């Protein structure tokens, strides 16, 4: 079993039985998970900022860093591996977008990331079936390839599923 570990700005897809797609310490970042239950294809992107126009060079170098590039690329990769081209059957979830800067969330990055992801999913004709967003704590997220279950954990808060 070989898990796929994603860092900030990375996206990936797995069909490996018994494995997980995982990312650590989502603060204001947002993870979008996509799962195709019949084909058992699991994908995730770890988005840091809403729009690539903030830094076009970074967008070219690391497109998953931005919601407007990363979410469509994740979907494209899911389709490449056999998912329906219009997203039919995909189970989409989103997590993160926390306000982690105690008392100083001037830029509202978490909220802006959440809204950007929802807008992009809407443009793709999709929406999340479950969310665990906002609040003021970081999350570690694991998407199980065999089941599509999304486990969330946070130090001091325990573990849960969405």
Swiss-Prot record:
Does the keyword Hydrolase feature in the UniProt annotation?
A: yes
Catalytic activity reported:
L-glutaminyl-[protein] + H2O = L-glutamyl-[protein] + NH4(+)
**InterPro entries linked:** CheD-like_sf, Chemorcpt_Glu_NH3ase_CheD, Cytotoxic_necrot_fac-like_cat
Highest taxon, organism lineage: Bacteria
Q: Name one GO molecular function term.
A: protein-glutamine glutaminase activity
Alphabetized Gene3D superfamilies for the sequence: 3.30.1330.200
EC number(s) given by UniProt? 3.5.1.44
The EC category is hydrolase
The alphabetized UniProt keywords are: Chemotaxis, Hydrolase
List the coiled-coil residues.
Answer: none
Q: Does the keyword Hydrolase apply?
A: yes
Q: Which GO terms describe its biological process?
A: chemotaxis
Query: Which family does the record claim for this protein?
Result: Belongs to the CheD family.
Query: What role is this protein assigned?
Result: Probably deamidates glutamine residues to glutamate on methyl-accepting chemotaxis receptors (MCPs), playing an important role in chemotaxis.
**What is the protein's given name?**
Probable chemoreceptor glutamine deamidase CheD
Q: Which organism is it from?
A: Syntrophotalea carbinolica (strain DSM 2380 / NBRC 103641 / GraBd1)
């Amino acid at each position: 079993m070989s898990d796929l570990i994603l860092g900030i700005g990375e996206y990936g897809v797995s069909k490996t039985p018994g494995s997980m797609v995982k990312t650590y310490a989502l603060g204001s970042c947002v993870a979008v998970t996509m799962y195709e239950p019949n084909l058992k294809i699991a994908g995730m992107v770890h988005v840091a900022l809403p729009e690539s126009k903030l830094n076009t060079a970074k967008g070219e170098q690391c497109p998953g860093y931005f919601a407007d590039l990363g979410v469509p690329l994740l979907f494209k990769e899911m389709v490449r591996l056999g998912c329906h081209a219009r997203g039919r059957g995909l189970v989409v979830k989103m997590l993160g977008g926390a306000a982690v800067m105690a008392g100083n969330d001037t830029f509202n990055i978490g909220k802006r990331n959440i809204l950007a992801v929802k807008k992009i999913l809407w443009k793709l004709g999709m929406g999340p079936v479950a969310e665990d967003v906002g609040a003021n704590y970081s999350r570690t997220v694991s998407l199980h390839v065999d089941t599509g279950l999304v486990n969330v954990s946070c130090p001091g808060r325990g573990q849960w599923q969405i």
